[in-house]
């Protein structure tokens, strides 16, 4: 997968290009990332990339020309790549969206600054707008890093074992189950005995039931959009009965 990033602060991306899962993916060649700074595409001695908005108002807007030229330069190596603008007005990024983006071999990310970019650039150059939530940040770099990290995890070979991605929260529409490691007993709390049993089928069912239970308790809205299979439905009903029995016994 190849990602081209357009940003005024490419140095910020060292947090994911040099460390952790994404850093290893880049070093191994599974993910390729390059950067284009709009300041390098300005034509004045001050390298001006922003200007005042027409109609007045607070803040500045990023100018079209430096961004447009940066996008054109990025497209020289990835001519068929979609251009994605990170914006609070975009489609909210979910695991489903991450999986869709991961099917693309290449894309260009535009990280805005100030009060945003000239609308005419969005109309002429941007293919998709994505948001990481209903809140405002100082720029698009952090959302771009979030998107890059999430999508990189889906690239075959990045996590070593594909099961790691398949079992993440939201990969099947559910929250993840609880996990435990040594010691076996911590502050009087033991690891659930089923996880020590060696019975892989029972462990699988326990984990699935815990995922359903946690989703039911913490994010019931997610279940409204899922078509549970017969096993999932039975396990969820079993958990609900157990919860009701426990409540009535108190």
UniProtKB/Swiss-Prot annotation:
Q: Which key words are in the record?
A: Cytoplasm, Methyltransferase, S-adenosyl-L-methionine, Transferase, tRNA processing
Q: Which InterPro entries match?
A: Alpha/beta_knot_MTases, tRNA_m1G_MeTrfase_C_sf, tRNA_m1G_MeTrfase_TrmD, tRNA_m1G_MTases_N, tRNA_MeTrfase_TRMD/TRM10
Q: Does the keyword S-adenosyl-L-methionine apply?
A: yes
Classification via CDD domains? TrmD-like
Show the GO MF annotations.
tRNA (guanine(37)-N1)-methyltransferase activity
As its record notes, the protein acts as a catalyst of: guanosine(37) in tRNA + S-adenosyl-L-methionine = N(1)-methylguanosine(37) in tRNA + S-adenosyl-L-homocysteine + H(+)
Q: Under which main EC class is this enzyme filed?
A: transferase
The answer on whether this UniProt entry bears the keyword Metal-binding reads no
Cell location: Cytoplasm
GO biological process terms, semicolon-separated: tRNA N1-guanine methylation
State how it assembles: Homodimer.
Q: Which family does it belong to?
A: Belongs to the RNA methyltransferase TrmD family.
NCBIfam families in UniProt: PRK00026.1 (NF000648), trmD (TIGR00088)
Q: Spell out the protein name for this chain.
A: tRNA (guanine-N(1)-)-methyltransferase
Q: Which gene encodes it?
A: trmD
